[in-house]
Every structure is written in structure tokens, then in C-alpha cells.
Amino acid sequence: MNKKKKPFLGMPAPLGYVPGLGRGATGFTTRSDIGPARDANDPVDDRHAPPGKRTVGDQMKKSQAADDDDEDLNDTNYDEFNGYAGSLFSSGPYEKDDEEADAIYAALDKRMDERRKERREQREKEEIEKYRMERPKIQQQFSDLKRKLAEVTEEEWLSIPEVGDARNKRQRNPRYEKLTPVPDSFFAKHLQTGENHTSVDPRQTQFGGLNTPYPGGLNTPYPGGMTPGLMTPGTGELDMRKIGQARNTLMDMRLSQVSDSVSGQTVVDPKGYLTDLNSMIPTHGGDINDIKKARLLLKSVRETNPHHPPAWIASARLEEVTGKLQVARNLIMKGTEMCPKSEDVWLEAARLQPGDTAKAVVAQAVRHLPQSVRIYIRAAELETDIRAKKRVLRKALEHVPNSVRLWKAAVELEEPEDARIMLSRAVECCPTSVELWLALARLETYENARKVLNKARENIPTDRHIWITAAKLEEANGNTQMVEKIIDRAITSLRANGVEINREQWIQDAEECDKAGSVATCQAVMRAVIGIGIEEEDRKHTWMEDADSCVAHNALECARAIYAYALQVFPSKKSVWLRAAYFEKNHGTRESLEALLQRAVAHCPKAEVLWLMGAKSKWLAGDVPAARSILALAFQANPNSEEIWLAAVKLESENNEYERARRLLAKARSSAPTARVFMKSVKLEWVLGNLVAAQELCEEALKHYEDFPKLWMMKGQIEEQEELVEKAREAYNQGLKKCPHSTPLWLLLSRLEEKVGQLTRARAILEKSRLKNPKNPGLWLESVRLEYRAGLKNIASTLMAKALQECPNSGVLWSEAIFLEARPQRKTKSVDALKKCEHDPHVLLAVAKLFWSERKITKAREWFHRTVKIDSDLGDAWAFFYKFELQHGTEEQREEVRRRCENAEPRHGELWCATSKDIANWQRKIGEILVLVAARIKNTF
């Protein structure tokens, strides 16, 4: 039997084996195996199946859906580049080679993922941080407000109302459950009458009384109320006021007992009891848990390393901050035992202890550290008596005689004579201290001071301050010729001793000398070091910057010395002479300016501006003949110079020498016939009332200079003055044909048409001007104002919007736009204007006017100052500033504005030019024009 048994019996069939397939046998199924056919609506055998699985049809649908889910080959799941999104072979068998391929792909993916992992994570981190910055969490947005909750007091917390829940309030809180306490007046009235009332007056129920019997027993006998005493008639009334007084008396008795106690430091001041309690509240802002952690950590540090001074100091300060001062003192005293050689621990102990105890601590510290300067200084600070301080410091100097700090502290307490004696000993003990040598030199006489400084130079040959002090000493005693030698010798000696000459440090020393009044020393230092370490081609630029820096530091003599040295090196540079002249004009005297200008024109005779500055200085001083002689010399050096001709004409006309001015202009027209010369000729005749001569000169000038717009303007204005509207219109039109880009000509023609009532024509002229001159703020501004003056505010606002689109950076337009808005919107408009034109004077002036209109006087004055500082040439800003000070300032403030305006000599501004160029005001000074313009301003903005 065993021999016939096949070896494969009982073994598992190989993979893919089908029984009988080798001999051609195939499996089949008969209907009897399946059973009779069933309808789709027939129930299945499982009668407990859930809905959707109870019929044969449901089972078929489910199996069909499962087959469909195997492979989703719909067009929506197909991509032209990647193919089907799902796996096409997901329904196939998953074999070993598939598993191996998946493992290889997974390894590749992992390898590729690790290649740039750090860079990718860094980028993702930065993106997340950027996202969090742009869109912070609500928690982060309110973090600063949450910090402020620490400032809320307990009373404010208690006063915060409960939020509650308003939903279903009627159902949750029915009216019959509301209890109302009986007022004291009810009991008082009841006791007075001595009667038992078991009902309430209807009027009391009407005004918040009881509609139902009180649950506590008002209709029934009150618990304890019917016993003899409270409800007994005539037993007296319940006085709440006396109960309160008794309670206060009891509190006073207790506080008196405590205050009378002398058994220790528990004596309490009854009046300051609550104040003392408030002062005992810890002032730290940390969390209690954080303090506990810090205390444990510091305790661990102290135990592991008890000889580490910072651990004891930190522990004491932690306890001090938390309000446990005695614990802090105990800790730091323990620290002095463990670290007796630590200065910091002893000083901290002295700081924490009260006065007398601190002195004892310092005395103990001195025994352990007899060479500690800081402890001696602290000991002197603890003494209140000057004699005691001196005694402590002298004792300290016996132990530490080479301490400069101790010598300085001791000298400060002495009288001058004693200080001199002490300093003579100090320089012996500390021969390398420059401060002690200089202090001794200041206290000595002139001869002794020279000896002291010589000794100081021998002991400290590398310090520049000794040399500078020696120079100042010689200057103070009138020996100015030695100052230059000392400074030169100082530079030589310091270089010989290997000291690098630091130019910036020497300039700072010179500025200090200037502020101390040592002018000669300051100038000598500047001359000695100004050229050190500078390339030859950079000298002029660097020196001008140095001069500006000195002026900014208010070291005027230093700046004057720099200019003098620069003029020696560059005697023919007009720009240097000009800078020096402007410096003398702003910070010097008239005499120094004129002396400088005389030297300037001698070196630069072709510089017209220097001649003109000299002539103007003489004219302003009232010396007209000297001004004439300067201009005569200027004519010799600059023949046919237009500027000098016109300056001479102005000089004569301002001094009412009209015939001389006419002759000068006639000569100028023949020798230097320029457009400006003709214009000044017309202007002179016009202001003198000779309109016929002015027109003739104007016609003659236009034959030669027809493209000069000011001549056409003057011709039209003269015609307007004579009320010849047609001729004026013709003059303006002819001028615009020759000068189509002249904005003032367009404005004059438009205003002429508006003046005669031709609003439509004026509007058309401005539209035409804007077409020929695009992006011109002045034309847009006039168009807006034209509509506003006509009462068409909506059209004016629309035009302003278009103007700001075309000229978004025009300060003139933005300043006008602010006041076109209604009052509530003006502040928003001003913010927009400042964003676009932050440094435009017109916008700053508009903001100042806005604050003025809101009666914010301080802010308005600040913005006026900003405006005139940014552009001092804007006359309108000065006029508004002066008007503001007339209404809200003092006499000194008004005079200050007027003085600054006269120094600035403004030439621009709409209101300013309209007044200053008026024929009636042609001889007015700057201050007079300022008053006239301010009078024209109506602060109705």
C-alpha cells in the first residue's frame, strides 16, 4: 500500500493548477446546481439584511457597481500628458515583481525627497512665517491688548458686567421666581406703629412691592419676629446708623491697640495702613510659577557652586523683586560668608541693607578687601557728613594711593587751596593721569601752571590735551603769539612719540575750545590739522563739509578758520568766496562781510554776484555813495553786464533818483540791449505813471524780443489798467501765439474773460491751454477755481479728481483738494496728500491751516515752522504764519516771524506775488509786504 502511494498526495497544488485541465476535463454547472430563476424583486434568503440589500436586484446592482469601481476609464479621468489618473492594472494580481518595482520606486522617491530636504523645509518655513506676518492669528492680533489687561485694577474687573445669555431668558427666569428683599423702611414703619400688618399697600406693589406673599413668612409669623423684643410694640426702632458707628468704633479700638504696641516692629500707623498695604504689593510682572522655577534653579546653583557670586546676587534680587526684602538680605549676607573676596556681593549687600547696617557691612567688606576702590567709594556715599566722607576717602587713599578715581572724589570735596595741595600729591602718586595734571594746572597761577604742564608733558608725552591746555593758558594770559607755536610743536612732538594725528579728534577739540572762548587756540588747531590725511583733489569738498559741520555744532570760529584756510589755498575759486560770504552774512557782522567781499572782488573781479553783494550791503547800511562806487568799479571789471546795469538802476530808483535811473537804462539799452533791460525800462515808466512812454518802450521791445512773455503780460496789464479790454485781449492773444507755453499768459487771458462776465469763454481758454500744456498743475488749479467761483462745486470736484489723476505729485493741487472737501473728510484727504507729497511746502502749509481751523494751536505752529524751514522762499507760507501769530501768538513771536521773513527775502507765492508785484507797492520793503499779504488773508478755511 505504501509503495503505491503517490508522492504528491497531501501536498499543496502548484500555482495556477486547475484539476483535470491536462486531460481535457472542464468544469460545468447545471441549472439544478443554481436553482430556479428568481425575479429582481424577490427577497433574498437573508431576511435580516439592511435596506438596499433585501432583494435580488439590489444584490445585482451592488455587484455591478463593484465591477465598475475597479477601473474608472471615464474621459474626465484622462489626461493627455499623464494618461489615466488611476491605476489601469489595479484589478490585476499583485505579484512579487510588482512589489519589487514599487519598492524601487519608493526608494527613488525617498532619495529624491532627501536631496533638497533642508532647503525645501527652510523655504516652507519662510513661506509660513511670511504668511503668518501677512495674516496673523486673532490671538497674535490681540496680544498687545491682552498685555494691557495686567494694568486693569481689581475694581475695574469687578465693574465689568456679566455677559449672560439673552436667549430664552423669559423661559429660564420666570417672573414668579424673582425675589425682592423687603426695604428697611418697611420694618422701621412697622416698629413705629407697633402694629402687625399682614398686607401691603397697593401703591407699594405698584412701585415694585410684593404681589405675592413673601416666602419667608410675612403673612405668617416672621421667624423670630414675634418673640418679645423685635415685634413688641414700642420697644424702640432699629437704628442702622448706630450699628455702623459701633463697627467703626470697634475697628478704631483694634488699630489703637496695634499702634500702641511696643513689643517689636509690628507698630502700625492707622492712617497710613492701607497706603502701606499698597506699597507692599510686589512690583514684579512675572508669573508665580516662573518665580518658583527661578527660585528652584538659583537654589540649585547655590548648592552646587556655593562660591559663585552671581548666584547669590541673582537670588537676592529675585527675592527683592518679589517683595521679600528680608529674605533677600539674609541670602546676600549668606553670600558674603561664602564669597568674602567678591566686590559685587559686598556692594549688593550694602545696597540692600538699611543705612547703619549698610555701613557695618561696608566696614566688614573693607577688612576682607582693603584694596577695593568701589567699596571705598560706596562707603563714602553712605556717609552724610562731609567730614566723614573726607575721612573715609583719606583712609582709602592710604591703602590705594594710585587710584585716580579716589583722588578725584577726594579733591571734589576740598576747598580750592586744599584741593591744590591734594592734587600736587595726587600727580606724584598717579603721574600718568592727564585729568589730575590738568586739574592742578587750572588751580595754579600762570607761572606755576606752565611748570605743571611741562612736568605733565614729560610724564605723558603722548597726550594732546596737555598741549591744547598749554595753548589755552597762553591765550588766556594774552600771549597769543605763542599759541600757534605750541600747537605746531604739539603736532611735531606727538608724531615723534609715535602718536597718530587723528584729524576728527583734533577738530572736536577745536570745537570745544571755540565753545570755551579760546578763539586763537581753536583757529591754531584748525590750521594745524585741517589738511592732514586728505587727498589733494578732495580738499575743497572736504573742507566745505567740515565748515558746514562746525556751523551745525555752533562752532562759528572753527568754520571761519576753515574758510580762511581754504581761501588761502584756493584764492581764485568763486564758489569758496561765495560760501564764505554767505557764512559772514548769516553769522558775522556787516563789517566782516564787507571786508571779506573787498578781498573777494580783488581775487575774482569777474564774479558779478560778489560785486552785487558788496553794493547791497552798503545800500542796506544806508551808505548809497559807497554802493554807487562799488557798482562803478564793477562796471569797470564787467562792462556791459546786465546784472550790474540792473543793480545800478534799482539802487537809483529805490533812492528816488528816477532821472539817473532813466539815463542808466538808456545807456544799458544801447550797450547791453537785453529783454530784461527793456522790461525794467517799461516797469520804471509804468510805476512812475508814464503809461504812454511805457507802451512805446513795450512796442519797441516786442520788435526785438517777441518771444519774451513778460513783455506781452505787461502790455496787456497796462491796457487793462486803462480799461481797454479789447486791446488787452488782443495783446494776450498775440502773446500766446508767440509763447503758447507761458502759463501766466493763459491765466491772465482767462481772468480777463471772467472779469468781463464771459465765463464760457474763460472755460474754453483754460481747456485749450491744458491741451497745449498737458500735466500743468497751475492750469488745472485755475480751472478748478473758476468753477468754484462760479458756484459749480460739483464740477470743481470732478475737475480736481481729473487734475490729480494727471498730476498726482502736485502739492499745489493736493493743498487745494484738502479744502474742497467737507470738514469731516479733510483730515483723510490731508493724509493722502502727505503720502503723495511728503516734503511739498504747499501740502505742509495746507496741513498747518487745517490744524489752525481746528484750533489746535501748538500743532499748527509746529507745521508752520516745518513749512518755512523746507521752503523759505514761499512768501504765502510766511504770510499765513504771520497771520496765525497775529491771532494766537505773542508780540515776541510775531516779531520773530517778521525778522525771519525779512532775512529769507521770499520771492514766490500766489498771494505774495500778487501783492509785491502790484504797481502801488513797488517801493515796499519785505516786512511791509508781509503785513499787507497777511491783511488780505481771511481765515475762513
Curated annotation (Swiss-Prot):
Keywords: mRNA processing, mRNA splicing, Nucleus, Phosphoprotein, Repeat, Spliceosome. GO terms for molecular function: protein-macromolecule adaptor activity. Residues 66-78 have a biased composition (Acidic residues). SMART domains: HAT, TPR. Gene3D superfamilies: Tetratricopeptide repeat domain. The keyword Repeat applies. Its main location: nucleus. Pfam families: PRP1_N, TPR_14, TPR_19. The modification Phosphothreonine is found at residues 180, 266, 275. The keyword Disulfide bond does not apply. It is found in: Nucleus, Nucleoplasm; Nucleus speckle. Identified in the spliceosome B complex. Identified in the spliceosome C complex. Associates with the U5 snRNP particle. Component of the U4/U6-U5 tri-snRNP complex composed of the U4, U6 and U5 snRNAs and at least PRPF3, PRPF4, PRPF6, PRPF8, PRPF31, SNRNP200, TXNL4A, SNRNP40, DDX23, CD2BP2, PPIH, SNU13, EFTUD2, SART1 and USP39, LSm proteins LSm2-8 and Sm proteins. Interacts with ARAF1. Interacts with AR and NR3C1, but not ESR1, independently of the presence of hormones. Interacts with USH1G. PANTHER family: PRE-MRNA SPLICING FACTOR, PRE-MRNA-PROCESSING FACTOR 6. This is Pre-mRNA-processing factor 6. It comes from Bos taurus. The lineage of its organism: Eukaryota, Metazoa, Chordata, Craniata, Vertebrata.
